A protein has these predicted regions:
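Metal-dependent nuclease catalytic cores that hydrolyze phosphodiester bonds in DNA/RNA
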Residues: 1-136
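Metal-dependent nuclease catalytic regions and adjoining charged, substrate-binding loops involved
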Residues: 97, 175-182, 187-278
């Protein structure tokens, strides 16, 4: 396979990424249709752009400027009193940056000490159950053996109901478990070990999108990392077989793509609805 670089990382489809894997977890049929170009996702780009706006700032001045050059039209207001400045949806991004940039604990963790070897946006790769997998890490401290993932989230401590844990939990718990970040970090830890032969400690720097952003350094316990990676291992071969055309993609029957393909050929009873897993 072609060597992975910053230039070809997003174009090379010979490797599976965590985000692409999660699309297939949600609905194989939709993910396959997206890959083939049969289906085009209509979604709000704001959360992704906001996250990348914050990420690029802490990567480097050059990375942030490049991001603004490529996406400025989407982030900057063209009319009104904010013309030339950030749109209201992205003003919180500056608040999130301000909350972190002068925080000594964050800077020590994310950027390391002057003598540390720290790499930003490090490409990692390897094989999971024989499937080629790649990823990009926000910040890796090669000197001290840890890596950091910067996550923007609605809130860290506001209480929410967790369907998985069946109790109220801080919002960060739902964010991590629902988006599978424990699996993502477990995966990246495994890929780093394959590349370096060393065990790295993963951390999340969480920053909230609240009017006054909250922030926290989170450590995912080993049992959660292992559980998340085990789930990926249990499903990744089937996903790769679907991608390669060796297996027909399954429909979830409930996403927008599946609804677009739906034909009314059966009657659903009230008890069917009550007993369904959906």
């Amino acid at each position: 396979m072609e060597e992975l670089t910053q230039e070809n990382y997003y174009q090379d489809r010979n490797w599976l990424t965590n985000s692409r894997f999660k699309q297939y977890q949600q609905c194989q049929a939709k993910a396959f249709a997206l890959d083939s170009g049969e289906w085009v996702e209509e979604r709000d780009e704001t959360p992704l752009l906001l996250g990348n706006y914050v990420h690029s700032y802490f990567e480097s001045e050059e990375a942030h400027q490049q991001f603004m050059d490529e996406n400025g039209e989407k982030l900057l207001a063209k009319t009104g009193k904010n013309k030339g400045n950030l749109k209201s949806d992205f003003v919180i991004g500056d608040k999130m940056i301000e909350s972190l940039k002068d925080d000594e604990g964050f800077n020590r963790l994310y950027h390391g000490y002057s003598s540390d070897e720290v790499q930003k946006e490090l490409i990692v790769y390897g094989k999971i159950e024989g499937v080629p997998v790649k990823g990009k890490l926000d910040s890796v401290n090669l000197s001290r053996g840890y890596f950091v993932d910067l996550k923007t989230m609605k809130s860290i401590y506001s209480e929410e109901w967790s369907a998985e844990l069946k109790k109220k939990v801080p919002a960060a718990v739902n964010n991590i478990l629902n988006f599978g970040y424990h699996g993502q970090l477990g995966l990246y830890r495994e890929l780093l070990k394959q590349m370096t032969g060393k065990d790295f400690r993963p951390y999340i720097v969480a920053v909230s999108k609240e009017a006054v952003p909250d922030r926290e350094i989170l450590k995912i316990d080993d049992e959660w990392l292992e559980e998340g990676l085990d789930k990926i291992k249990s499903e990744i071969v089937e996903v790769w077989d679907v991608i390669q055309g060796k297996q027909k993609p399954k429909k979830c029957e409930h996403c927008d793509y599946c609804r677009s393909q739906k034909k009314l050929n059966a009657v659903v009873t009230l008890n069917d609805l009550i007993e369904s897993d959906y």
